[in-house]
Amino acid sequence: MAKSSRSKTSKAWLKEHFNDPWVAKAQEQGYRSRASFKLLEMNEKDRLFRPGMAVLDLGAAPGGWSQVAGQLIGGRGTVIASDILAMDALPDVTFIEGDFREEVIYEQILMALGDQRADLVMSDMAPNMSGNSAVDQPRAMYLAELALDMAERVLEPDGVFLVKVFQGEGFEDYRKALQSRFKRVVSRKPAASRARSTEVYQLGFGLK
């Protein structure tokens, strides 16, 4: 019975995915995922990218956000992408495969940054969803906490932190944690986010 239920859920997801206008738009414009449009919209509102900056993209695969960063910054800055999953190469993006919680991967990230700190740390990480919010929400919050920890370690004092968070248990506490660490915190729900999704992006500007 459970297997049948999962099969129905998978079929429904596939139908939604292939009928999604943002997925079609991504394919037409050569972006790796619909997530690219979320970042493009947030950049229009918040001017996240500028020439010469250093960007760290956590949980980057398949590369939708790194692709945008690479295009907007080009060879005039540094874009570092990290994920435990493999990712096809992108122009002007340095990819580091592995778990950034591990010291060896963290050191590789620092080496890629060189003598600079990151101007923008961004995370679109999400766990593999089971459909059980009691399981999924803590996993999602844990990933957001990992991203925040990394941001505090590598960000410039006036840097920006962009992270995906899911509304639910732990969300308000996480937002308070951001407000205690950053001078300004704003929420964003891009048009390319699915309406039924509880995801909401948090932006922290300038470490306190």
UniProtKB/Swiss-Prot annotation:
Protein name: Ribosomal RNA large subunit methyltransferase E
Family: Belongs to the class I-like SAM-binding methyltransferase superfamily. RNA methyltransferase RlmE family.
Coiled-coil ranges from the UniProt annotation: none
Superkingdom of this protein's organism: Bacteria
Catalytic residues identified in the record: 164
GO terms for cellular component: cytoplasm
Keywords: Cytoplasm, Methyltransferase, rRNA processing, S-adenosyl-L-methionine, Transferase
GO molecular function, one term: rRNA (uridine-2'-O-)-methyltransferase activity
Annotated residues for binding of S-adenosyl-L-methionine: 63, 65, 83, 99, 124
Species this protein is from: Alcanivorax borkumensis (strain ATCC 700651 / DSM 11573 / NCIMB 13689 / SK2)
Compartments in which it is found: Cytoplasm
Primary role: Specifically methylates the uridine in position 2552 of 23S rRNA at the 2'-O position of the ribose in the fully assembled 50S ribosomal subunit.
Catalytic activity of the protein: uridine(2552) in 23S rRNA + S-adenosyl-L-methionine = 2'-O-methyluridine(2552) in 23S rRNA + S-adenosyl-L-homocysteine + H(+)
PANTHER family to which the protein is assigned, alphabetical: RIBOSOMAL RNA METHYLTRANSFERASE, RRNA METHYLTRANSFERASE 2, MITOCHONDRIAL
Record EC number: 2.1.1.166
Keyword Methyltransferase annotated: yes
Keyword Chloroplast set for record: no
